[in-house]
């Protein structure tokens, strides 16, 4: 029977061979962490390679995602549908083994990692979801939600600020099922880290309230195993500090940055094989090694045992069992569509001139009563973002049965934690901050879009309408940057009806994130027919039309729709034929068929004006070079909002005069 070291060496061999064949990649971390991975995956990780979606599996996250050959090797050896040919195709076009682990490619990859610090933060979200789902569904004698979240991370993850945001909150919330392994190898791309990373990491994590196990020999299986056992027994999140040698097994490059991010080279790989006693050719794993690694039988037995537990739970609590299945499968409640549409119709029939942030809260109130899977939150701005509703109950370390997370001032951490919650399953996460501060969180929203996971962000205080707080808090280019992100759905509604439609579609959207952008100031509700209400979902629609063919089209979003309508009324009174198009979601409009887009924006009507209190340049796509844009070309100013709108040209007079110049 192969020794544990020999089993770990299988990871080392596959990792150095995969990087060498691709002629790019990072062999150092996989070779350094192979012993830890062998102990965790063969001795502790509850998973089933034949069903990577098993609801109560342990989650494993490789936060130092550049070491991707580590997880690819583990998945292959354990029996997942990842062949040796897939490993040979490492970093190649359309392979299941891209340079950094990507969710949705290889089975068993729980999240896309690579931007350092986000993996550990996703893992915090997964651990929060596990604890909340357990609190909501487990009954005495029936622990149907009971799994750990394990994460590997390196020095780079800990240097990134997001690791502070996430790990601080994890300690506060007592996430005892979260176990992190710090790959303390002292090396980063630039060399030995003591010149730029001299933190006392164990004390840092003790200060967060974590259980810290220091100075574990990362190449000693017994020490690693003992640390994991101690971690599992402690009610706090655990940091296991593993001292490792980067590139372990490479005689001439281990312990240095030379093996961090480049192939070892054929000569050094041969030397490593000799040093490790690994006598097999590249990509060849002997049968006895495969046999020891294969987790399919054990995984199937573990899942079968859980299925029996769930059957007993379902017999005792049939309603809860059905609800658990619905939520884990990501299905919306029965009659959702009918009830949601009625809510929207009622809003149209009962006009209210309110801020769209208040309209958002009203939508939460209406929809939330149907959605126990809601998991809300805000980055310490709940009274401003209006993200709490009557059914909101805050999560606390001692009581995780609620549905609202106080993230504190942690925009980046919040957004990446929400990605983890969404990836775990069982919840529809929403979070919030001022639109300006989405900048802190932009990369986590990009990751949500890349992974195609549901992440609903409420961004309030959406323009110079914020007023006196000034340009540090007034967004200008942020809406455009969200719209330009692939697979991001971005909504800027003009009233309570568009706001409710935006919320409904964000709740229904399972294949990507949604940015819902709301105003601080009150907005007038617009009259609409039932057909117009239905057309809101198309992202752009005719709100007010001319008698006969229009000679001018005004396109507006959010708070500027009311302005466009008033300007159109004045122009119409002067004999102009003016159409007003409300375009709350350009991405949704762009997805409509050509016939619909042409019906809203006829190509032969070139006199067009776009009006939005955001960066002007975005709108040339819709108005053309012959059109005009009333938008922002500079940062804002500190002053009352009404003065700012006048100063920057968001007035009926300016729209009317611009229209007359265009039509002259």
UniProtKB/Swiss-Prot annotation:
Its cofactor is Mg(2+); Ca(2+); Mn(2+); Co(2+). GO terms for cellular component: cytosol. The active site is at 411 (proton donor). SMART domains: Transket_pyr. Keywords: Calcium, Magnesium, Metal-binding, Thiamine pyrophosphate, Transferase. Thiamine diphosphate binds at residues 66, 114-116, 156, 185, 260, 437. It comes from the Bacteria. SUPFAM superfamilies: Thiamin diphosphate-binding fold (THDP-binding) (SSF52518), TK C-terminal domain-like (SSF52922). GO terms for biological process: pentose-phosphate shunt. Substrate binds at residues 26, 260, 357, 384, 461, 469, 520. The record marks 26, 260 as: Important for catalytic activity. Binds 1 Mg(2+) ion per subunit. Can also utilize other divalent metal cations, such as Ca(2+), Mn(2+) and Co(2+). Belongs to the transketolase family. Catalyzes the transfer of a two-carbon ketol group from a ketose donor to an aldose acceptor, via a covalent intermediate with the cofactor thiamine pyrophosphate. Homodimer. PANTHER family: TRANSKETOLASE, TRANSKETOLASE 1-RELATED. This is Transketolase 1. It comes from Vibrio vulnificus (strain YJ016). The gene is tkt1.
């Amino acid at each position: 029977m192969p020794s544990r070291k020999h089993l770990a060496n299988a990871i080392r061999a596959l990792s150095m061979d995969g990087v060498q064949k691709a002629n790019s990649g990072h062999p150092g971390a996989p070779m350094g962490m192979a012993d830890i991975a062998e102990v965790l995956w063969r001795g502790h990780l509850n998973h089933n390679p034949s069903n990577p979606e098993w609801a109560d599996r342990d989650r494993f996250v490789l936060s130092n995602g550049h070491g991707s050959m580590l997880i690819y090797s583990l998945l292959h050896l354990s029996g997942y549908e990842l062949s040796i040919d897939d490993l040979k195709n490492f970093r190649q076009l359309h392979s299941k083994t891209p340079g950094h682990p990507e969710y949705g490619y290889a089975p068993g990859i729980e999240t896309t990692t690579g931007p350092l610090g986000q993996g550990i933060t996703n893992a915090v979200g997964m651990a929060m979801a596990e604890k909340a789902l357990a609190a909501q569904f487990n009954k005495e004698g029936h622990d149907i939600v009971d799994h750990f979240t394990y994460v590997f991370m390196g020095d780079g993850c800990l240097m990134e600020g997001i690791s502070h945001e996430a790990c601080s909150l994890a300690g506060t919330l007592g996430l005892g099922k979260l176990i992190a392994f710090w790959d303390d190898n002292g090396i980063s791309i630039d060399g030995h880290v003591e010149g730029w990373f001299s933190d006392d990491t164990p004390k840092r994590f003790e200060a967060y309230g974590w259980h810290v196990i220091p100075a574990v020999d990362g190449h000693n299986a017994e020490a690693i195993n003992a640390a994991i056992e101690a971690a599992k027994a402690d009610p706090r999140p655990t940091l296991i500090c593993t001292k490792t040698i980067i590139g372990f097994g490479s005689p001439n490059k281990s312990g240095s940055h030379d093996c961090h991010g480049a192939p070892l080279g054929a000569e050094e790989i041969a030397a490593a094989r000799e040093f490790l006693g690994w006598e097999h050719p590249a990509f060849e794993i002997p049968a006895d090694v495969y046999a020891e690694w294969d987790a399919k039988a054990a995984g199937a037995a573990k899942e079968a045992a859980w299925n029996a537990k769930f059957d007993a739970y379902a017999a005792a609590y049939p309603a809860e069992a059905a609800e658990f299945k619905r939520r884990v499968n990501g299905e919306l409640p029965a009659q959702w569509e009918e009830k949601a549409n009625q809510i929207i119709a009622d809003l149209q029939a009962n006009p209210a001139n309110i801020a769209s942030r208040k309209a958002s809260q009203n939508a939460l109130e209406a929809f939330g009563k149907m959605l126990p899977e809601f998991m809300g939150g805000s980055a310490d701005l709940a009274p401003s973002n209006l993200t709490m509703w009557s059914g909101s109950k805050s999560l606390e370390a001692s009581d995780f049965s609620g549905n609202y997370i106080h993230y504190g001032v942690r925009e980046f951490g919040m957004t990446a934690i929400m990605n983890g919650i969404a990836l775990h399953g069982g919840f529809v996460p929403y979070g919030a901050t001022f639109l300006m501060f989405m900048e802190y969180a932009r990369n986590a929203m990009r990751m949500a879009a890349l992974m195609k996971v549901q992440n609903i962000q409420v961004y309030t205080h959406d323009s110079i309408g914020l007023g006196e707080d000034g340009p540090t808090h007034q967004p200008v280019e942020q809406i455009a940057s969200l719209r330009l992100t692939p697979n991001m759905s971005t909504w800027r509604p003009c009233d309570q009806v568009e706001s409710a439609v935006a919320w409904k579609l964000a709740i229904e959207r399972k294949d990507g994130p949604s940015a819902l952008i709301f105003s601080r100031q009150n907005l007038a509700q617009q009259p609409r027919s039932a057909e117009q209400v239905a057309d809101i979902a198309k992202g752009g629609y005719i709100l007010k039309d001319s008698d006969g063919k229009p000679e001018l089209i005004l396109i507006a979003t959010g708070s500027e729709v009311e302005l466009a309508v008033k300007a159109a009324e004045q122009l119409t009174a002067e004999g102009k034929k003016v159409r007003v198009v409300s375009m709350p979601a350009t991405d949704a409009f762009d997805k409509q068929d050509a016939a619909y887009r042409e019906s809203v924006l006829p190509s032969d009507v070139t006199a067009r004006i776009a009006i939005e209190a955001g960066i002007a340049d975005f709108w040339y796509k819709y108005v053309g070079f012959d059109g005009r844009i009333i938008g922002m070309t500079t940062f804002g100013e500190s002053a009352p909002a009404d003065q700012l709108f006048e100063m920057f040209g968001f007035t009926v007079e300016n729209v009317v005069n611009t229209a007359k110049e265009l039509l002259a």
